[in-house]
Design a protein with these regions (language model features):
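Active-site-proximal beta-alpha loop/turn segments in soluble metabolic enzymes
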Residues: 189-200, 224-240, 269-282
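Short beta-strand elements
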Residues: 50-57, 64-68, 172-194, 249, ...
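Metal- or metallocofactor-binding catalytic centers and their adjacent structured scaffolds
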Residues: 67-155, 159-160, 204, 232
């Protein structure tokens, strides 16, 4: 049996068992969907996105907002936009019409607590691999809204859990480059990972203090400029390695120990600087092997625990070469490589292309499929990171997903701006009930 079929079969069996064990008590049952309604709202970049309400017969309302990415993978599910002149071509009228038309027709009358049935009903209408007919943004809005309606005044993280939960370690983007900033820095995200603490509130405090420390470090160096889409500082720098130096300086200046308490994670987003002749970084053109050796030199000099998208989304050989050489000492994360897609992930598992995956709900389009991919990754021994998008909303559902799936890590931007802090604040609330904190990276 091919690996992809074997893994998917195992995951679907486990997912079916998890769904059957979800709390189908009177508190959750009987929430028959009476109305699905979509509308346009604005995201953190001032672009249109979708908000969906799910109303049930008992009066429960579930509401969800859908994020949007800037550096998007070519293999992601389709985010349906209107094109034309209105809203700069980024309107979502067609996607909203799909929510209020065919999606509503398919979901009204179903039990919101049966997530698999809800999502399957939408996938039956749109069976395209990329969700090009209805739009992944339309489908995800409805999927998340139904999940919220099913839970009502309960907790999403408890509803989706199989019994193992923990507050994730945050990967906090404090210096922005690439497609997320108007600067000359190629690397898209320089993140801090406050792993050397006993509780999430302690880690959050360290992250916030280092964020403000970096502002002072950059100001003193005459480099304080604007901020990026995710709230991190966006200076022009002589070279990408300077970003690492300034982050280490900020950690020390805030009174913390680099490596022991706080480490660094990178989202290189290398697809953004990959051209026909190679990778264009720091004014040089490199092939995959040369770029991998550059990363290795950074690993030798800085407390880096995670590198996301070090190579292009179809440069499989470079991924495998680097993971086989460095995977024992760094988390190699596929985002554009996998786009939360089970077929792409199965290929990566077979090729030993990475040892971790970034999970973005809008890359695949439904809650159920997201849970399947998380299950596949865990079955393969992969690390899992639940992630926001650069165009975010006040919706905090990814915090619940990270805790409920015991993902261990969450990536949701700088500890600033309400579209980012809504997730950090939700984790604070959850930590009042869930006292287990992820121990990832604490061996360092």
């Amino acid at each position: 049996m091919p690996l992809v079929e074997l893994v998917e079969r195992i995951v679907m069996i486990n997912l079916k068992d998890k769904i059957e064990k979800m709390p189908h008590s009177p508190r959750y049952m009987g929430r028959r969907i009476s109305r699905i309604f979509g509308r346009m709202v604005l995201d953190s970049r001032g672009n249109p996105t979708i908000e969906v309400d799910c109303l049930t017969e008992d009066g429960t309302i579930g509401r969800a907002m859908v994020p949007s990415g800037a550096s998007t993978g070519r293999h992601e599910a389709v985010e349906l936009r209107d094109g034309g002149n209105r809203w700069g071509g980024k309107g979502v009228d067609n996607a909203v019409s799909n929510v209020n038309g065919p999606i509503a027709d398919a979901l009204v009358g179903l039990d919101a607590s049966d997530q698999g049935v809800v999502d399957t009903a939408m996938m039956t209408i749109d069976s395209t691999p990329s969700k090009a007919k209805l739009g992944a943004n339309a489908m995800l809005g409805a999927s998340m809204a139904c999940l919220r309606a099913a839970v009502g005044d309960g907790e999403i993280w408890q509803h989706i859990s199989d019994g193992q939960t923990s507050i994730p370690v945050p990967l906090m983007n404090i210096l922005n480059g690439g497609a997320h900033a108007n600067s000359n820095v190629d690397v898209q995200e320089f993140m801090i990972v406050p792993h050397g603490f006993e509780s999430y509130p302690e880690s959050l405090r360290a992250g916030v203090e280092i964020y403000h420390s970096l502002r002072a470090v950059l100001r003193d160096a005459g480099l304080l400029g604007g901020v990026g889409d995710e709230g991190g500082f966006a200076p022009d720098l002589p070279c990408n390695e300077d970003g690492l130096r300034y982050v280490v300086d900020a950690i020390i200046s805030a009174g913390y120990q680099p490596g022991n308490q706080v480490s660094i994670a990178l989202d290189v987003a290398s697809q953004e600087f990959l051209h026909d002749d190679g990778y264009h970084i720091d004014g040089k053109v490199m092939n995959g092997s040369d770029l991998g050796r550059l990363y290795s030199s950074w690993l030798d000099s800085y407390p880096i625990v995670s590198i996301e998208d070090p190579f292009g989304e179809d440069d499989w050989d470079s991924w495998t070469e680097f993971t086989l050489r460095e995977g024992h000492r760094v988390q190699v994360v596929g985002d554009d490589l996998y786009v939360t897609n089970p077929d792409r992930l199965a290929k990566g598992i077979e090729k030993n292309a990475s040892n971790a995956i970034l999970i973005k709900l809008n890359q695949i389009g439904t809650v159920t499929e997201t849970l399947v991919v998380i299950g596949m990754a865990k079955a393969a021994g992969f690390g899992t990171i639940i992630s926001h998008r650069s165009g975010e909303t006040a919706d905090s559902i990814i915090a619940d997903i990270a805790v409920g799936t015991n993902a261990g890590q969450i990536k949701t931007g700088a500890p600033a701006r309400s579209d980012r802090t809504s997730k950090y604040n939700q984790l604070l609330r959850i930590s009042e009930k869930c006292d287990s904190y992820s121990k990832l990276f604490q061996h360092r």
